[in-house]
Amino acid sequence: KEELGKSLTIAAIVLMVNSFGMVVGNLLGGSLFDKLGGYRTIMIGTVTCLISTTLLNFFHGWPWYAIWLVLLGFGGGMIVPAIYAMAGAVWPNGGRQTFNAIYLAQNIGVALGAALGGFVAEFSFNYIFMANLIMYVLFAIVAITQFNLEINAKFKPQDSIDLKSKENKKRFTAMMLVCAMFAICWIAYIQWETTIASFTQSINISMSQYSVLWTVNGIMILVAQPLIRPVIRLLKGNLKYQMFVGILIFMLSFFVTSFAEQFTVFLIGMIILTFGEMFVWPAVPAIAHKLAPTGKEGAYQGYVNSASTIGKAIGPVFGGVIVDTFNMQIMFLAMMALLFIALGFVYLFGKADAKYVKND
């Protein structure tokens, strides 16, 4: 708003279109992985991102900023499912650990990116574009030198994959149920970045205090892994039960936070929320990897990544409408109700076909 002189409504529309670009990128990237392999798919996405970030450095006024942002979302969307599918191919027996490693790496990247972004923006907002380009150049170097691997993955030609077989239909149905659950979880989770963020400011909790919540979130994800391992062992590595536990913890977080009027209660709510995501977020791509028929590993990772992107896009609008129409208390209740529905999807997933993913 400050840099481009556009309304918050226009900003919201641009972000929605950016999310749409990411969804298309997720689905295309997953499909290309199955046809071209991980290295080529990642390079196509990386080149797309390099083009968009380069153009952003020279043309970042209106409407060029919005156009390049959507292109960047599309390119980045292609890369993510390919990386997940490649990780599954490189470490096929890693199960949850494979995707938990990516989850931890993503968290480190988000934390460092936010910190460095704030530091760079102190000098000039324009430097953000240059920093972004430098990061993609570094990523391209890593991709070119490290990702061109001979992966022992069993790819099948697309016309040899019988998608209409009874078994594959069951797998696809189970995958769609997990995607519905994942999207709902993200609709709820994203409220912490939108409606809850606005609510904290309205009750005189400072931005610095609010940022502490996410600092705690990031630190916990890295250091609290040993705390959830006994629970995972108790669940015998059952991914369905891990999702059940995680969603119940999400619901508890929203219940506790619904009473919050002081920073300490928000902090407790965030700590509870973080434990929930540590169960759910790595379990979903692990399920996608195990459900995917041979030759569709990329497509299934594309499905789950697009589901999370859709949840992130819908969540702010959905939560904002509820708060504007009713109040924050109704929003908290609505999120708990949605998460209860998500539990239903996990239950149906178990009924549909969980034989491929029972133990990790």
Language-model features and meaning:
Residues 70-106:
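Cytoplasmic helix-loop-helix junction between adjacent transmembrane helices
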Residues 47-60, 248-261:
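C-terminal ends and interior cores of transmembrane alpha-helices
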Residues 52, 63-71, 264-272:
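Paired small-residue
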Residues 1-9, 194-210:
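Short amphipathic helix-loop junctions that connect adjacent transmembrane helices
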Residues 128-145, 332-348:
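Symmetry-related core transmembrane helices of the 12-TM Major Facilitator Superfamily/SLC fold
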Residues 25-37, 224-237:
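Helix-to-loop junctions at the C-terminal end of transmembrane segments
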Residues 102-144:
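Helix-loop-helix hairpin linking two adjacent transmembrane segments in secondary transporters
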Residues 148-179:
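Juxtamembrane intracellular "pre-TM" segments in multi-pass secondary transporters
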